[in-house]
UniProtKB/Swiss-Prot annotation:
It catalyses: tRNA(Ser) + L-serine + ATP = L-seryl-tRNA(Ser) + AMP + diphosphate + H(+); tRNA(Sec) + L-serine + ATP = L-seryl-tRNA(Sec) + AMP + diphosphate + H(+). This is Serine--tRNA ligase. It comes from Sorangium cellulosum (strain So ce56) (Polyangium cellulosum (strain So ce56)). The gene is serS. Belongs to the class-II aminoacyl-tRNA synthetase family. Type-1 seryl-tRNA synthetase subfamily. Consists of two distinct domains, a catalytic core and a N-terminal extension that is involved in tRNA binding. Homodimer. The tRNA molecule binds across the dimer. PROSITE patterns: AA_TRNA_LIGASE_II.
């Protein structure tokens, strides 16, 4: 969430920055907010005037005889002022609550380094690694490869759960498991992350903290309450970002402990409410998928460097697996709701002839930290400050399976196993289950 005080004091400037995202983003900070800010300012001025009158009345009473009529009169005036002050404080509190509610659906401000653009076409490719694999045959899509080898069963998945689910069979299931282990080992043993295995169900407060609620409720799977005494709702996590970021919600961290780096494997669950008719074939867009997530917490002055470091850690997975990819800096119009800067890692899929996102590495600045109240103390007696948070997939496991099937396919329909995974898999080539 944006800083309410900063927005109130620089409303036109903030709207201009939001307009770089889209007209809708600028409109999200509407006239309601401006009028609420104005009402708060007026009430604070009135409150301060009454507080000054109360202080003056207290000073006057101190000079009066407690048995005099004047003392009794001042005492009555003081009681009336105290009542007014209490009422005014309540009004200010309600107005500040309203400001927070209005800001809860306003996206983050783009970092000045983000390219300006209206949508995906405005993204800028900043680097690429490796070469597109060449084939002596027409490369197939992963769904054709997986089906022919008996590794991907879409029909039985539909029988079990409906559309956008897949059953991985035999070697495909082992490949998924091998990738999870390979990614976690790389991140924890070589890159310094602490492995976390969080709950896959979270409270609505956690989803508010990361910015998923209230704006993106339709993309979440909400459970039904079996216990009427439970005071909160539980949701299936859309990403490990949610529970891992909220590990430190409502905490004040020791500045000496920063940066903090976590790696977590979880299944993820998304309703894909806004993607009807898109990517209906294969593993690209599923209701349930596996992901290894990196989350970092840093001091503001180290934020940009930590974001670049996290991105390089996600890239290293692709490099080790020998998968050709490129890195795109998202433009202002394509940024996610809470992000101030994002790099997308896009892997080449020769069977489809396209690059597809396999990781989004985002810096949120203090946007999530303000919502979740994650702070740190730079020095032992210093005033707490908001941390900066950043995260990225490293990687989306199902999409990594897709990339391996398509980039490592052979003319006979088999698939070469990338060298780093062979010890996990116990084979060099996928020939079937």
């Amino acid at each position: 969430m944006l800083d309410p005080r900063h927005v109130a004091e620089h409303l036109d400037e903030v709207r201009a920055a939001l307009a770089l995202r889209s007209p809708a983003a600028a409109a999200s900070l509407g006239d309601d907010f401006a009028s609420t800010v104005s009402a708060r300012r007026s009430n604070i001025q009135e409150l301060e005037r009454w507080q000054a009158e109360r202080n003056a009345a207290n000073e006057a009473m101190a000079r009066l005889d407690k048995k005099s009529p004047e003392f009794a009169q001042k005492r009555d005036e003081l009681k009336a002022l105290s009542t007014r002050i209490k009422e005014a404080e309540q009004v200010v509190s309600e107005l500040e609550k309203r400001m927070t509610e209005l800001l809860s659906v306003v996206p983050n401000l783009p970092d000045p380094s983000v390219p300006v653009g209206a949508g995906e076409e405005g993204n800028v490719v900043v680097r690429a690694w490796g070469e597109k694999p060449s084939f002596s045959f027409a490369p197939k899509s992963h769904w054709d490869i997986g089906t022919a080898l008996g590794l991907l069963d879409f029909e039985r998945a539909a029988k079990l759960s409906g559309a956008r689910f897949t059953v991985l069979m035999g070697a495909a299931a082992r490949l998924e498991r091998a990738l999870i282990s390979f990614m976690l080992d790389l991140h924890t043993r070589e890159q310094g992350y602490l492995e976390v295995l969080p709950p896959f169900l979270v409270k609505d407060t956690a989803l508010f903290g990361t910015g998923n609620l209230p704006k993106f409720a339709e993309d979440l799977f909400k459970t039904q309450k079996s216990d009427p005494e439970r005071a909160y709702d539980l949701y299936l996590i859309p990403t490990a970002e949610v529970p891992v970021t909220n590990l430190h919600a409502d905490e004040i961290l020791d500045g000496a402990s920063l940066p903090i780096a976590y790696a977590a494997y979880t299944p993820c669950f998304r309703s894909e409410a806004g993607s009807h008719g898109r990517d209906v074939r294969g593993l690209i867009r599923q209701h349930q998928f596996d992901k290894v997530e990196l989350v970092r917490f840093s001091a503001p002055e180290d934020s940009a460097r930590q974001h670049e470091l996290l991105t390089s850690h996600a890239e290293e997975v692709l490099k080790r697996l020998g998968l050709h990819y490129r890195v795109s800096a998202l433009c202002t119009g394509d940024l996610g709701f809470g992000s101030q800067k994002t790099y997308d890692l896009e892997v080449w899929l020769p069977g489809q002839g396209v690059y597809r996102e396999i990781s989004s590495c985002s810096n949120f600045g203090d946007f999530q930290a303000r919502r979740a109240q994650i702070r740190y103390r730079p020095e032992p007696k210093a005033k707490p400050r908001l941390v900066h948070t950043m995260n990225g997939s490293a990687l989306a496991v199902g999409r990594t399976v897709i990339a391996i099937l398509e980039q490592y396919q052979q003319a006979d329909g088999t698939v070469v196993v990338p060298e780093p995974l062979r010890a996990f898999m116990g084979c060099e080539v996928l020939r079937g289950r």
